[in-house]
């Protein structure tokens, strides 16, 4: 149907719901896609002229992995990975290795949205207080290095950088766009998503 409608790409959103080699508790009992299933979906899409693009999470939205002691050392707070901990980057490397094996696309969305409490848990205990924006940027640079190692080009959700510039809920004027652009590495594309401006407060003249 999507092919008939003219679509040439589709994004498959996952959190811990895909199989990662070397990480048996990642997606354990969560109905995760196996590598074989991902390859089958990828081939099915490709046969119809559609690129299947993985959307993963490399910072937040990973709360269910922290049910297991294996991942306790890399939990910052809530559903957020501990930035700067090498085990965090081994996990992310394993993620990308699995993506490279199971997808033909070399475009990936690395997530990184809604990490509201970034740096306020174990990270702060270890390193002291630091602005989340600087933690975010440092983590992003590491993730981009890993992605490049496997030949991936990255896009990500832009809300964390936008919130840093605009406040708790960023404005629709985008008058800080250049400021945001300067803070983001040139080899990643920000995608703006917005649940907020559908409410009366932001639609009224």
Give short role names for the model-derived ranges.
Residues 1-155:
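Feature activates predominantly on carbohydrate-active enzymes
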Residues 202-205:
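Conserved small/polar residues in nucleotide/adenosyl-binding loops
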């Amino acid at each position: 149907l999507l092919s008939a409608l003219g679509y040439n790409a589709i994004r498959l959103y996952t959190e811990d719901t895909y199989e990662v080699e070397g990480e048996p508790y990642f997606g354990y009992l969560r109905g995760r896609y196996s590598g074989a299933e991902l390859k089958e979906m990828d081939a099915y899409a490709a046969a119809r002229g559609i690129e299947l693009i993985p959307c993963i999470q490399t910072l937040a939205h990973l709360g269910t992995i922290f049910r297991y002691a294996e991942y306790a050392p890399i939990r910052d707070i809530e559903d957020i990975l501990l930035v700067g901990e090498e085990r965090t980057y081994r996990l992310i490397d394993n993620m990308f290795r699995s993506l490279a094996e199971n997808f033909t696309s070399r475009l990936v969305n690395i997530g990184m949205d809604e990490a509201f409490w970034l740096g306020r848990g174990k990270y702060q205990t270890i390193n002291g207080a630091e602005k989340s924006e600087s933690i975010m940027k440092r983590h992003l640079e590491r993730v981009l290095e890993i992605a490049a190692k496997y030949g991936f080009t990255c896009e990500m959700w832009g809300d964390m950088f936008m919130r840093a510039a605009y406040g708790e809920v960023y404005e629709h004027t985008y008058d800080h766009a250049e400021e945001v652009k300067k803070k983001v590495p040139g080899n990643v594309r920000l995608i703006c998503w917005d649940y907020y401006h559908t409410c009366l407060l932001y639609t009224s003249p």
